[in-house]
Design a protein with these regions (language model features):
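Extended, low-hydrophobicity, polar/charged segments
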Residues: 1-161
Length: 161
């Protein structure tokens, strides 16, 4: 199971006990925010893309979307998300549990500047019902090969019904 792989990965940093396992799904930003009793923007969503030759993950705030212009300027390719059947093979995690922890060596990891607005965020931990509360500094420590980028834009708030 991917969560066990993440638990082992986080054990090297003394953080395996900080994984939050939920009784309900946290597979989407909204579900995760509800389950964790936090705002959607504090969910660190992990988006998986295909580069020129290798897959990569961009971790961004839950209220953000990829800005196609910034993305192309940064990565020199159009934003092309991995297909459903490619996600687990390229990230070691199924859709709903994709995270920056315990991913294959060939998969690059980027942290988007949108995360820096918060004192802490909640990335998934390999399953559709797990997360961990971390600061951006802690995320940098837990994912030492990650690089910071600025490729997202904040979504416009939706009007209330």
């Amino acid at each position: 199971m991917a969560i066990e792989r993440v638990r082992e990965y986080l054990r090297a940093y003394g953080r395996e006990q900080d994984i939050i396992e939920l009784d309900t799904s946290s597979a989407t930003v909204e579900l995760a925010a509800t389950a964790l009793h936090t705002k959607p923007e504090r969910i660190a969503k992990s988006l998986s893309f295909m580069g020129k030759e290798q897959p990569f993950i961009v971790v961004c705030a839950g209220d953000c979307k990829v800005d196609n212009h910034k993305f192309k300027e940064t990565f020199h390719v159009k934003a092309k998300m991995l297909k459903g059947d490619e996600v687990e093979r390229c990230t070691n995690h199924a859709i709903g549990g994709v995270c920056p922890f315990a991913v294959p060596e060939g998969t690059a990891i980027y942290l988007d500047a949108s995360l820096r607005r918060f004192d802490h965020v909640f990335p998934a931990c390999g399953s559709a019902n797990s997360a961990i509360r971390v600061s951006c500094e802690e995320l940098e420590t837990l994912v030492p090969r990650a690089r910071w980028v600025d490729v997202c834009k904040q979504e416009a708030p939706q009007p209330a019904d």
